[in-house]
């Protein structure tokens, strides 16, 4: 690489790092003062063993140090080798909690029950980053910068990226109400209201491998209503950088990727949940308050024993419950803000997670398995 190109690359890298720093400085803290303070319900002791997402290691350490100020007799052992390893730790009973950068899929939920006779419970503990890669970032929908389109609804995205389907997965259930006909496919820019030369131009669809793990199931759940039928002409890329470079040369292309993969030749679109709106741009504030439709949560998962297990304890482990109460408190979410990679939860989401933690409802796996 000659000196001129090296200088250009250095300048681009510097600009990208500055943008990333700006996106991660501070926190969207308007809800933090209204979150409940952590007040211990009981004194607990013992060791909490965690497995799972290594990207959450720094955040976990902050939670641990802060929690032990309130519960000094609790210790932690962390084995964080990746999200998939978190499920294995729960199944083998070598972990009490799993840190997850994504939601569990139906096969993991069934598998956990079949292997360990336990029911997994997901608790949202933070929102993924608005920008930072590998930190469960929100998805942006990109088009070429010369494309006059500025916004889409999730239904339109389904029409673009999806295809005819007989239903979709909703947690553990196959939902036939998620079915849609091929007549709802959107394959030209004119079908989205563009005029002139755009009317009959095809929509060239770019994305990660359609059967990929991690982030792809989130897109299927949110955009394809849990279905797995993709646009028949989907161009699949394992390398996101290459995908975005190709999109930059294609005026008729559209792609989904983390915001950090953007470049000067593409632009992100505003999105709306429904036709009624509102249209919401992808930025840090809108990801943090969850108004942007493709913001992604991160989770802590624990398990409850089936009451027929020989080592059954159908209650939530008290030390795990106290730790999760701390994470969902003002102090726990302040730790999220201070860590800087992830975003604190809005008050409404915190309240929903506390209700789930306190719930006495029968686990859905038990209902579906007819136990």
Locate the predicted segments by residue:
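Flexible loop/hinge segments at secondary-structure junctions
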Residues: 27-371
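Intrinsically disordered/low-complexity terminal segments and short unstructured peptides
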Residues: 4, 21-23, 50
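Bacterial N-terminal signal peptides
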Residues: 10-24
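N-terminal secretory signal peptides that target proteins for export/translocation
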Residues: 1-8
């Amino acid at each position: 690489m000659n000196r001129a190109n090296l200088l250009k690359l250095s300048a681009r890298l510097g600009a990208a790092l500055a943008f990333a720093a700006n996106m991660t400085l501070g926190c969207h803290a308007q809800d933090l003062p209204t979150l409940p303070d952590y007040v211990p319900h009981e004194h607990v002791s013992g060791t909490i063993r965690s497995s799972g997402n290594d990207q959450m290691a720094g955040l976990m350490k902050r939670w641990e140090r802060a929690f032990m100020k309130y519960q000094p007799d609790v210790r932690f052992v962390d084995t964080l080798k990746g999200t998939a390893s978190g499920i294995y730790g729960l199944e083998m009973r070598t972990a009490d909690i799993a840190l997850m950068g994504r939601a569990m899929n139906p096969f993991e939920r069934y598998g956990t029950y079949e292997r360990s006779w336990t029911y997994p419970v997901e608790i949202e503990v933070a929102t993924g980053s608005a920008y930072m890669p590998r930190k469960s970032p929100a998805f942006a929908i990109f088009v070429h910068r010369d494309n006059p389109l500025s916004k889409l609804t999730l239904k339109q995205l389904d029409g673009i990226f999806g295809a005819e389907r007989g239903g979709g997965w909703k947690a553990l259930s196959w939902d036939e109400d998620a079915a849609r006909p091929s007549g709802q496919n959107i394959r030209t820019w004119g079908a989205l209201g563009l005029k002139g030369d755009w009317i009959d131009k095809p929509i060239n669809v770019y994305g990660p491998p359609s059967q990929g793990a991690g982030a792809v199931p989130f897109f299927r759940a949110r955009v394809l209503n849990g279905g797995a039928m993709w646009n028949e002409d989907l161009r699949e890329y394992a390398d996101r950088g290459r995908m975005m470079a190709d999109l930059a040369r294609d005026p008729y292309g559209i792609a989904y990727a983390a915001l950090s993969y953007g470049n000067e030749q593409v632009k992100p679109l505003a999105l709306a949940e429904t036709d009624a709106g509102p249209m919401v741009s992808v930025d840090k504030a809108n990801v943090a308050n969850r108004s942007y439709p493709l913001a992604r949560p991160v989770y802590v998962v624990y398990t409850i024993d089936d009451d027929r297990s020989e080592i059954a304890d159908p209650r939530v482990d008290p030390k795990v419950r106290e730790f999760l109460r701390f994470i969902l408190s003002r102090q726990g979410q302040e730790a999220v803000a201070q860590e800087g990679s992830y975003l604190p939860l809005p008050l409404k989401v915190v309240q929903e997670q506390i209700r789930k933690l306190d719930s006495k409802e029968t686990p859905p796996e038990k209902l579906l398995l007819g136990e």
